[in-house]
Amino acid sequence: FPAAAALIQAFGWRGALVFIGAVLLVGVAPLHAWALRGPALASTARGADEKADATLHEALRQRSFWLLTLCFMLYAFASAALWAHVMPAFAAKGLSEAQALAVLVWIGPAQVAGRFVYAWAGRGVSLRLLGLFVLLGMPASLALFALSTQLWPLFGFALLFGVANGLVTIARGGLVPQYFGR
């Protein structure tokens, strides 16, 4: 956030978006492609594990598919709505841009910390329980944000929102194959 704020101040929001997009395109996309590179999958007959995988047509007929889709869609909607309105919301609380950034900068580290804690200690936690934590953690963080009238509780919002937002990627990436196969 501080870097984005500095880019916006220096180049305006359009210029900042162009710069960020260029960094993603030139720097992040090639790294991502390199990291995902692996041995080509050999064309083999369907194995015993693959027979249990649901086809797209089968998945679309399952209630669990639509419930997961709805949960992840609403989560994404709430997250996007937060990012669209977070700075005006801080301003409405009477807080400066610097104070807002001091809080928001903790979301990223909390995302990473949540993933590390899960990788280290959460392997015994079912993906369903993880998903439940995520789907309760995000609205709880938003309630904390809405009800906070002081600066310090907003750090709790940032940490809880960050952890939930970091863990949603694990829940989303794990629940779909668990329910429908790969």
Regions found by a protein language model. Give the residues of each.
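Paired small-residue
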Residues: 152-160
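Helix-breaking motifs and short loop linkers at transmembrane-helix boundaries and internal kinks
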Residues: 126, 147-149
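Structural signature of the two symmetry-related core transmembrane helices
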Residues: 129-144
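MFS-fold secondary transporters
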Residues: 31, 141-145, 161
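Intracellular juxtamembrane helix-capping segments at the cytosolic ends
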Residues: 1, 167-180
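Flexible cytoplasmic inter-helical loops of multi-pass small-molecule transporters
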Residues: 35-54
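Helix-loop-helix hairpin linking two adjacent transmembrane segments in secondary transporters
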Residues: 1-40
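Extracytoplasmic gate region of multi-pass secondary transporters
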Residues: 1-4, 57-120
